[in-house]
A protein has these predicted regions:
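Sec-dependent N-terminal signal peptides of Gram-positive bacterial secreted proteins and lipoproteins
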Residues: 2-20
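Active-site-adjacent loops and short helices of periplasmic peptidoglycan-processing enzymes
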Residues: 21-194, 198-207
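Domain-terminus/edge residues, biased toward the C-terminal soluble/receptor-binding domains
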Residues: 1, 173-177, 185-276
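Low-complexity, intrinsically disordered regions enriched in charged/polar residues
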Residues: 8-11, 29, 230
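Residues in and immediately flanking transmembrane alpha helices
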Residues: 15-16, 97, 224
């Protein structure tokens, strides 16, 4: 994960001021005491040094959607918990339509409580507010909380996933097929760095999302004997000025992946990498 954060950090700093200048090729001498041609690297060569261990990557500007950098951006890979970016879109839409309220209480099913991976250890029939469940998803990447929402909105997780795929099509994206709401490894569950960046672009149209994705740590079940500490899986929000989201991911199949957002000087960038 440190390597991923370093790469995104490098993209946010390096790309906007250099690589966004389409057609320009600058040459940098990294060692002023060296005078042979091997001492000099073009921007492209410097970028390639950063991405040796990454399968795919993309950086876009939010407002225009302009691609500032890409590597194998349309290649399909398991997206792990970045899947939850789409899940959160559907949740936010339900809230904005008034079909869900932050103060509503939802009940965990046995199925939701049985989820593995990242979780807040919900028990079957446990009740929790929409706001706290959403914190669990956005901050802690909780699979059990995600399935609670999926079952509430879709009736079943499968029907919720159908809605996720319908949303993908409505956005005109062609590299994504979801099989579950959480991102746990499953056959035929895939996306691309390109699609994840533009799915993220859709999510952050709901500006309320930043009230959650910028939280580094919080607690659930306060004033109980089962207090649960949430720590944001996205360390960039603590270490990189302007970082305000968005979603990390890791599974054995996917490797490490991250879709990150950051804003400085009225410009927000969205970076997505897969397969680190």
């Amino acid at each position: 994960m440190k390597k991923i954060c370093l790469f995104i950090f490098s993209l946010f700093i390096f790309i906007p001021f250099v690589s966004a200048l389409e057609g320009d090729v600058n040459v940098t001498n990294e060692n002023p005491n060296c005078t042979t041609k091997d001492c000099y690297k073009t921007n492209k060569e410097q970028e390639d040094d950063l991405i040796t261990d990454l399968k795919s990557a993309i950086l876009i500007e939010e407002d225009s959607g302009k691609i500032l950098y890409e590597k194998n951006a349309h290649d399909r890979y398991a997206p792990a918990s970045m899947t939850k970016i789409m899940s959160m879109i559907l949740i936010m839409e339900e809230i904005e339509k008034g079909k869900l309220k932050w103060s509503d209480t939802l009940v965990a099913s046995e199925n939701a409580a049985s989820m593995g991976g990242s979780q807040i250890f919900l028990k079957a029939n446990e009740k929790m507010s929409v706001k706290d469940l959403f914190k669990a998803v956005a901050i802690g990447s909780a699979n059990d909380a995600t399935v609670v929402f999926a079952e509430k909105i879709g009736g079943t997780e499968k029907r919720f996933v159908d809605k996720m795929n319908e949303k993908v099509k409505s956005l005109g994206l062609k590299d994504t097929n979801f099989k579950n709401a959480t991102g746990l490894d499953e056959a035929n569950h895939y996306s691309s760095a390109y699609d994840m960046a533009f799915i993220a672009r859709e999510l952050i149209k709901h500006e309320k999302i930043f009230d959650f994705t910028t939280i580094y740590e919080d607690y659930l079940r306060q004033n109980t004997d089962n207090k649960f500490w949430l720590v944001n899986t996205n360390k960039l929000i603590k270490t990189y000025e302007g970082a305000d989201g968005l979603k990390t991911g890791y599974t054995k199949e996917a490797g490490y992946c991250l879709t990150a957002t950051a804003k400085r000087n009225r410009m927000r960038l969205i970076g997505s990498i897969m397969g680190a």
